[in-house]
């Protein structure tokens, strides 16, 4: 079995570090596996990792400690660095190289006055470089020190000079330091804006640090957003990989090429944005006509990378822009295969893809469907989602391993859910379950996946048998399906049975005439002439049977070899050819038949009739009894093997004690005689009182008595009791075995009609056979309706109909019990609430004291308040339900009480409405009276004031 890819769908993808993105870059580049559960960033391509590593390096172009260490290692560097930091240049000689080193130090440590002093008075070289080719202008721009950069440029510093590694110029340094002033200063001094564009220009460095203003200035002054070489990193790649949406927008507004590819992986900007879940960047790229299904070197689309990294936001965006959800990449995998990476987010991606129409049964080049991968990784939620969307659980890999096999071993919790789906496939109409008009509809579409229509209709049942879940065949849906299938192929089986019956009868007649008929020695033994004709007919029929076996073997040798009936058929065919030979076909002298042919004929005639019994046992009406016989025979053989040593012991002992007796003269005959004596055929008188005297009387009597007690009494009864101890269980087991054999028989017959060996046969004949064998020719018609209470409905046997009826009745009773329990809970809560509302509210203890105006909080009042505010309990539910009749009466009484309560509530509501209306009228009258009183008081006040003023004037 193919366990090579267990829990591995992308074994060449890289991990993302859980730590800060600025740390452990080497580890980020080296680890290869699937993203873990704890990692939420997804998986990255090689190109994305390359961009990430370069961005970490360019965030701090040159570390200050590293620069200081480089300057100190120069000749006299430590002394010069100390002088620059102290600002004293008295010991600096004009003809010494120290002045150039001091100029570099001044550009590093940011001293404008000292820089100008060195350039004017010491004639320092503005283009001097350290051991790594870095000039003072490099350091000034890297430190974003525009004044020093201006001074250096005024004294002739070269703005386009490279460092020793040909990696950066002063413009690169200014862009990396986010210095707009330095960039403008350099551009005004004729700095080449596209210098280094073959690898990485200043625009790349500005994007590395997300310097939006610098990017805008560079683009405004003519920076090229594209690169002249193919498969090189463009600024758009850099911005998309980092998720800098504003930079992406600026680049796109300046005609950046959205189709350009980068690196050996040939990834586009949309690939980089999709695999890192930068939704805004992806949206901008798609709005500017980026190809939604563009492919990289591995034939992956952005949707594949988004699913691999579990970028659900980007997945939804790409689907909304028409991404092909069924596009395949390496090894024939689809986006649905790629989405099964980690369980925490796989379900969201899978749901989005399935909603967009992803093919849930699409297999990769190894035969693995998404259901296989989900089951292997033990993602039960994804497994159930796939099954809900029509995934074929019978789909097999190239190693012939079904998805159901993975489900049973890796996600066994799906099996009960599968049983629930089988239950839900049997539905009844709205009629009462005991009504004659009650109809039950059985939907077989779950048993016949859409992808298996070209392989027959019993593939699921065979898969259940294969993985050890054959008890599911006893489900009413499966049992009904098997019965209907049997009814469809019954005609083919009857033809086969008739053919075998004819063959057995002719062969039996031939054996009787050739091998059984007794002739006197002095007479010539001659058979009738038609016996030779029968012999030739037997040979022809036998060759046809062997041809059928050859066809079945060519159809599938592995499946053919595992059925013992096929080996029995080859044994019979070979034996018949040995029995019906030219010597036996001649009827003039039957005494010339060799003795060995009599032995062969005796064995073959037994096997022929045994095979006919097994064929008859395939009928449902006889199958249980034949299976019970087979089961008991197998059990009896096991027990006989367990006690074979005891029988051998007694056989040898009898051979020693009774060697004169004919049955015990030979050890072989002695053993066979011991087995015969188990059935009770002891022959005590013949052995002890016959013609032969017992040589060892005492020992012989003891051994014989021991045999009678241990074997005839104990062992025989024990074996019979163990073999048939549980008749009811034996019937159930036999019924299950019958269903298994019936399913295998139907499947084998169907497989012959769909065999590739019949492609050259007439098409009309094959289609006729298929229509005769298949239950329905259309998937939408895989439904069957019965009326269990209608005596005229005889479509199904009574036992199957009863099982279907029980399942529907139990489910309906269970639902009614749940509804009844919910009603009782709601009614109890409502009745208690109503009682609390009708209970008078005790507010005496809330009245304030006459003197203090505060509430008197006594222990009695507090207890009473607690009782009033205590929440109503909803747990007073009866533990045991009443009988059905009592429950119905109680529900009617409760409904009457509820109606009365609702009427009282309506009356109270009407009274409250009247009270509210009266209160509103009272408040309006009170308001008018209050306004009138206020006006009168104002008028009286004015009148009093006028009277008082006139009185004062008169008094004066």
UniProtKB/Swiss-Prot annotation:
Gene3D superfamilies for this protein: Ankyrin repeat-containing domain
GO biological process assignments: calcium ion transport; monoatomic cation transport; negative gravitaxis; potassium ion transport; response to heat
Keyword terms, alphabetized: ANK repeat, Glycoprotein, Ion channel, Ion transport, Membrane, Repeat, Sensory transduction, Transmembrane, Transmembrane helix, Transport
Source organism: Drosophila melanogaster (Fruit fly)
Extracellular compartment residues: 513-525, 585-601, 660-701
Subunit and interaction comment: Homooligomer; between isoform A and isoform B.
Tissue expression pattern: Expressed in various peripheral nerves and the central nerves in embryos. In adults, it is expressed in sensory neurons lying beneath the bristles around eyes, neurons innervating the bristles on the back of thorax and neurons in maxillary palps, proboscis and antennae. Expressed in multidendritic neurons, which mediate temperature sensing, as well as non-multidendritic neurons in larval epidermis. Localizes ubiquitously throughout neurites.
Name assigned to this protein: Transient receptor potential channel pyrexia
């Amino acid at each position: 079995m193919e366990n090579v890819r267990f829990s591995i769908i992308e074994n060449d993808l890289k991990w993302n570090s859980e730590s800060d993105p600025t740390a452990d870059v080497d580890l980020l580049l080296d680890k290869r596996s699937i993203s873990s559960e704890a990692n939420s960033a997804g998986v990255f391509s090689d190109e994305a990792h390359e961009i990430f590593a370069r961005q970490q390096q360019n965030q701090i172009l040159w570390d200050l400690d590293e620069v200081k260490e480089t300057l100190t290692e120069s000749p006299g560097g430590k002394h010069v660095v100390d002088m620059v930091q102290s600002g004293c240049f008295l010991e600096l000689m004009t003809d010494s190289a120290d002045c150039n080193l001091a100029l570099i130090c001044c550009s590093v440590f940011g001293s404008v006055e000292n820089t100008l002093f060195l350039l004017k008075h010491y004639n320092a070289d503005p283009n001097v470089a350290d051991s790594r080719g870095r000039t003072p202008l490099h350091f000034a721009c890297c430190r974003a020190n525009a004044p020093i950069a201006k001074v250096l440029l005024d004294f002739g510093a070269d703005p386009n000079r490279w460092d020793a590694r040909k990696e950066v110029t002063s413009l690169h340094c200014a862009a990396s330091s986010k210095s707009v002033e330095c960039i403008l200063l350099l551009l005004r001094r004729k700095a080449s804006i596209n210098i280094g564009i073959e690898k990485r220009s200043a625009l790349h460095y500005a994007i590395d640090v997300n310097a939006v203003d610098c990017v805008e200035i560079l683009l405004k002054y003519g920076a090229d957003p594209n690169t002249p070489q193919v498969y090189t990193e463009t600024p758009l790649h850099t911005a998309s990989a980092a998720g800098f949406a504003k930079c992406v927008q600026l680049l796109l507004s300046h005609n950046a090429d959205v189709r350009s590819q980068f690196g050996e992986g040939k990834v586009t900007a949309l690939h980089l944005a999709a695999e890192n879940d930068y939704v805004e960047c992806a949206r901008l790229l798609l709005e500017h006509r980026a190809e939604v299904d563009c492919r990289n070197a591995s034939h992956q689309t952005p949707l594949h990378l988004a699913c691999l990294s579990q970028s659900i936001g980007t997945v939804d965006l790409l689907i909304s822009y028409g991404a092909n959800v069924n596009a395949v990449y390496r090894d024939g995998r689809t986006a649905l295969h790629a989405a099964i990476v980690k369980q925490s987010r796989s379900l969201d991606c899978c749901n989005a893809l399935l909603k967009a129409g992803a093919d849930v049964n699409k297999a990769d080049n190894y035969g693995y469907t998404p259901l296989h991968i989900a089951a292997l990784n033990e993602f039960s939620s994804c497994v159930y989602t796939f099954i809900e969307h029509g995934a074929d659980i019978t789909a097999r890999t190239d190693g012939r391993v079904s998805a159901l096999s993975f489900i049973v071993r890796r996600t066994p919790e799906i099996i009960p859910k599968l049983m629930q789906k089988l239950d839900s496939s049997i539905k009844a109409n709205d009629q009462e379950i005991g009504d004659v008009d009650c109809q039950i509809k059985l939907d077989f579409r779950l048993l016949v996946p859409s992808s298996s229509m070209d392989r027959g209709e019993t593939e699921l049942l065979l898969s259940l048998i294969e993985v050890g879940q054959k008890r599911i065949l006893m489900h009413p849906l499966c049992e009904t399906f098997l019965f209907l299938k049997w009814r469809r192929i019954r005609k083919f089986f009857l033809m086969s049975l008739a053919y075998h019956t004819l063959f057995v009868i002719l062969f039996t007649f031939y054996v009787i005439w050739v091998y059984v008929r007794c002739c006197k020695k002095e007479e010539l033994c001659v058979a009738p002439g038609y016996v030779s004709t029968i012999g030739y007919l037997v040979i022809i029929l036998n060759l046809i049977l062997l041809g059928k076996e050859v066809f079945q073997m060519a159809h599938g040798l592995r499946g053919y070899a595992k059925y013992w009936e096929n080996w029995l058929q080859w044994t019979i065919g070979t034996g018949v050819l040995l029995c019906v030979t030219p010597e036996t076909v001649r009827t003039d002298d039957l005494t010339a038949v060799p003795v060995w042919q009599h032995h062969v004929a005796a064995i073959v005639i037994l096997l022929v009739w045994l095979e006919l019994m097994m064929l008859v046992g395939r009928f449902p009406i006889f199958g249980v009894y034949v299976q019970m016989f087979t089961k008991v025979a197998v059990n009896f053989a096991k027990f006989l093997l367990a006690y074979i040593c005891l029988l051998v012991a007694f056989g040898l002992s009898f051979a020693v004690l009774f060697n004169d007796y004919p049955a015990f003269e030979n050890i072989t005959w002695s053993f066979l005689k011991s087995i015969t004596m188990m059935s009770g055929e002891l022959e005590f008188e013949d052995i002890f009182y016959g013609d032969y005297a017992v040589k060892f009387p005492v020992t012989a009597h003891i051994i014989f008595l021991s045999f009678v007690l241990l074997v005839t009494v104990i062992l025989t009864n024990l074996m019979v009791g163990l073999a048939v101890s549980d008749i009811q269980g034996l019937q159930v087991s036999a019924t299950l075995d019958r269903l298994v054999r019936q399913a295998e028989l139907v499947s084998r017959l169907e497989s012959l009609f769909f065999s590739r060996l019949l492609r050259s046969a007439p098409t009309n004949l094959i289609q006729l056979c298929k229509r005769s064998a298949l239950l329905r020719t259309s998937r939408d018609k895989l439904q069957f309706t019965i009326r269990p209470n209608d005596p005229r409905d005889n479509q199904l046997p009574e036992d199957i109909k009863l099982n279907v009826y029980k399942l529907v009745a139990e489910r309906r009773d269970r639902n009614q019990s749940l509804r009844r329990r919910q009603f009782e809970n709601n009614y109890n809560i409502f009745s208690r609430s109503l009682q609390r509302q009708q209970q008078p509210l005790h507010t005496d203890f809330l009245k304030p004291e006459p003197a203090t105006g505060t509430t008197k909080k006594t222990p009695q009042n507090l207890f009473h308040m607690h009782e009033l505010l205590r929440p109503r309990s909803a747990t007073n539910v009866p533990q045991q339900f009443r009988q059905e009749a009592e429950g119905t009466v109680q529900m009617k009484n409760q409904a009457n009480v509820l109606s009365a309560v609702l009427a009282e509530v309506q009356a109270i509501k009407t009274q409250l409405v009247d009270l509210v209306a009266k209160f509103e009228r009272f408040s309006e009258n009170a308001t008018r009276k209050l306004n009138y009183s206020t006006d009168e008081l104002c008028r009286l006040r004015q009148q009093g004031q006028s009277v008082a003023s006139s009185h004062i004037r008169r008094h004066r």
